[in-house]
Amino acid sequence: MNIILLGPPGAGKGTQASRLIGKYAIPQISTGDMLRAALKEGTPLGLEAKKYMDQGALVPDSVVIGLVKERIQKPDCSKGYMLDGFPRNVSQAEALDMMLGELKQRIDGVVCIEVPNKELLGRLTGRRTCRSCGAGFHVMFDPPKTDGKCDKCGGELYQRDDDNEATVSSRLKVYEDQTKPLIDYYEKQGKLRRIDGVGSMDAIFGRITAILG
């Protein structure tokens, strides 16, 4: 089973991904991990990517597709794989389809975890971090015993800049703008599986596995 996992920041994608790879015994493939591995191993594609990264430029799609192609031909992908964080746009999705066609493979399903923006804002802006020890809390899901104080060391809890409402709203808008055309692309192919991402992690996992089989 070859699947793609989509979902906005705060949708619980990471939790579901780790459970899915356990259930289906398939590896999770992220472009970040692939790039780091290629750089460490000094592969031709890794060296090619390094040229762009050293200049602070984005690694071209052709290089990323090459890395994906190498990765999915490894033995641990024989039963399938889950792509996480790729493709990010329609041009990448088209290039991926073309490459998979050459390998006589295809994407079987695209799981899109959907959560209303109001819920996502609550999840993402509710995070609090201890200034002293770095421990993490959440005002809704994991509140400290004393408001504003760390349970572990008594340090002051604060909201990081990237967790404030303006920054979170901006991140969600970027995701929406980038991903909407991608969702439409896979919907037209009949591969999109929309999942209600509100509820317990167990309930959401159950919805995903019910659709994937």
Curated annotation (Swiss-Prot):
Q: Which GO terms describe its biological process?
A: AMP salvage
For the region NMP, what residue ranges are annotated?
Answer: 30-59
- A GO CC term attached to the entry: cytoplasm
Instruction: Identify the EC number(s).
Output: 2.7.4.3
Q: Where in the cell is it found?
A: Cytoplasm
The residues that the entry says bind AMP are 31, 36, 57-59, 85-88, 92, 160, 171
Alphabetized Pfam families for the sequence: ADK, ADK_lid
Q: Where is this region: LID?
A: 126-163
Binding of ATP: at which residues? 10-15, 127, 199
Question: In which family does this protein belong, per the annotation?
Answer: Belongs to the adenylate kinase family.
Q: What does the function comment of this entry state? A: Catalyzes the reversible transfer of the terminal phosphate group between ATP and AMP. Plays an important role in cellular energy homeostasis and in adenine nucleotide metabolism.
Tell me the NCBIfam families matching this sequence. Answer: adk, PRK00279.1-2, PRK00279.1-3, PRK14527.1
Which protein is depicted?
Adenylate kinase
- Organism (species): Syntrophobacter fumaroxidans (strain DSM 10017 / MPOB)
UniProt lineage: Bacteria, Pseudomonadati, Thermodesulfobacteriota, Syntrophobacteria, Syntrophobacterales
Gene designation per UniProt: adk
